[in-house]
Amino acid sequence: MVVKKYIVALDQGTTSSRAIVFDHQANIVAVAQREFTQHYPQAGWVEHDPMEIWSSQSSALVEVLTRAGISRHDVAAIGITNQRETTIVWNKHTGKPVCNAIVWQCRRSQAICLDLKAQGVEDLVRQKTGLVLDPYFSASKIKWILDNVEGAREQAEAGDLLFGTVDTWLVWKLTQGEVHVTEPTNASRTMLFNIHTQEWDEELLDLFNIPRAMLPEVKPSCAIYGYTELAGNHIPVAGMAGDQQSALFGQLCIEPGMAKNTYGTGCFLLMNTGDKAVESTHGLLTTIAIGADTKVNYALEGSVFMGGAVIQWLRDELGLITDACDTQYFADKVDDTNGVYLVPAFVGLGAPYWDADARGAIIGLTRGANRNHIIRAALEAIAYQSRDVLDAMSKDSNVPLTQIRVDGGAVANDFLMQFQADITGVTVIRPQVTETTAMGAAFLAGLAVGVWKSTDELKTMLSTEREFTSTMDITTRATLYKGWQKAVSQVSPNGDVG
C-alpha cells in the first residue's frame, strides 16, 4: 500500500482563506488563496458572510490540490487553523446562518459587556476563562445575536440553532452537517469555556443567557473529527487550533518558557507556561495552548495593536516610503533615531497598557530629525512594544526568556529582527518556513493520522534560517528603553505599567 504523504492545512484568516499543501518532510508544495468581502454595516461593526467564508475556503482547497499536482487519494488528512472569536450561529436543519458572522474586531456588544461589569462579574469571568470582559470574545456576540436577530432566541431555546467559531463551521460544512465540534484553543476564546475544568461552564452560560444545546462538543486539538467528501474522496479532518496557538505549535514552542511573536498587522506574543494556568497581573490574557505530544498546556498572550500597520501608515498616509521593504534601507542609513520615538497608539494601546484612549505621537523631534530617523523610530516602536509584552510575560511567569521564535511578514526585515534582539537581550530565531500558522495545523493533522509519530519527530523538520543575537551593551539598552517608557507615558496615563 502506498503511504499517503501529503497534508493540507486550511488557514482561514480575517481577510482571506488559504490552503497549503505540506509534504512528509513539512515542506510547502503549493499554496492557494481567496480573499473575501469585509462588511462594515455601522461604525465599529465588522461582519463576514459565513457562506462566503465557506465558498472561499472550499474553492482554495480544490485549487491547491490542482496546483500541487497531486490526487485527492494522496492526501492523508486536512488540518484547520482559523481566525479566533469570530461568531457564527446557524439553523441545524437548513444549514443557513441566522445572520452574518460577527468578526472578532466587532465592538457591537460593548453595552452587554459594560452591563456585566456593572453587575460585578468581571473577576468571576477572568478567574474561569483567563480573559478580560470585552466584546472581542464570542460570548457577548452570541448573546447579541440571540437578543437582536428576530426569532433567534426562540429557535435557540427550541434546540434548532448551533453556534460555532470558524473552525466549527468549517468542519460542519466539510462533513455535510454531520459533525458539530471544536477544540480547546478555540473554545478558550469564547468566554464560555472554563480553562481549568476544560468544559463549558454552566455559570457562564447562565450569565450570558446562552442555551447549552447550541455549543459544539469539545474534542482534543489533535484528533480525527470526521471525514470530508469535498475533494472527491474520504479524507480525514484531523487537527485544529486557533491561529495564534497554531503558530505557537508550528514553531514547536511546546515546553514551558518557550515563546513566539507573530509580526502581522499587529503583533501576537504567546508564551507556553506548561500545565500551569498563570494568572497575569501585568495585563496579559491566560489561554490554552498545545504542548508536547499535543497535551493541553496553558499560555500567556499579549497583543500589540500596531505592528506592520505602522509601516503601512508610513507608506499610505505619510508617503515616506513607497514599499514596506524600503524601511530597512532607510533605517540603516542612520546610526540611531536622533532621540525620536514614535508611539503608534492610533487605536489606543494594547497589552500591557490597555488604554483605548491613548493616541499616537512622534516625540523628541529636533531640527536635525529627518525622514530616516522617523522611519527607524517606526521600526523600533514595533520592537519596543514587543519588549513591553515580553517583560510582562517574564514577570508573570517568573521565567526569564532567553529566546523568542518569530514569524509573520515583518520578520523578513533584518533591521527589525536585530533591534528586537538588541532591545530585549534575547536571541531572536527566524525559521526557514515562516508559514508557521498553517504548519501548526498540518502538524496536528499529521500526528492525528500517524503521518508523524511524535513531537520529537517534528523537531527534526524545523530548520532555522537565521538567529539574531544582541550586540547592544546593557547601558545603551536601558537608556533607550527608558526613553520609550517616557514617550509612552506622555500619550497614556497607563504608561508607567512597567
UniProtKB/Swiss-Prot annotation:
Pathway: Polyol metabolism; glycerol degradation via glycerol kinase pathway; sn-glycerol 3-phosphate from glycerol: step 1/1. The keyword Endoplasmic reticulum does not apply. One of its GO terms (cellular component) is cytosol. Its EC number is 2.7.1.30. One of its GO terms (molecular function) is glycerol kinase activity. It catalyses: glycerol + ATP = sn-glycerol 3-phosphate + ADP + H(+). It comes from the Bacteria. Glycerol binds at R84, E85, Y136, D243, Q244. ADP binds at T14, R18, T265, G308, G409, N413. Keywords: ATP-binding, Glycerol metabolism, Kinase, Nucleotide-binding, Transferase. Inhibited by fructose 1,6-bisphosphate (FBP). ATP binds at T14, T15, S16, T265, G308, Q312, G409. Sn-glycerol 3-phosphate binds at T14, R84, E85, Y136, D243. CDD domains: FGGY_EcGK_like. InterPro entries: ATPase_NBD (IPR043129), Carb_kinase_FGGY (IPR000577), Carb_kinase_FGGY_CS (IPR018483), FGGY_C (IPR018485), FGGY_N (IPR018484), Glycerol_kin (IPR005999). Gene3D superfamilies: 3.30.420.40. Key enzyme in the regulation of glycerol uptake and metabolism. Catalyzes the phosphorylation of glycerol to yield sn-glycerol 3-phosphate. Belongs to the FGGY kinase family. This is Glycerol kinase. It comes from Shewanella frigidimarina (strain NCIMB 400).
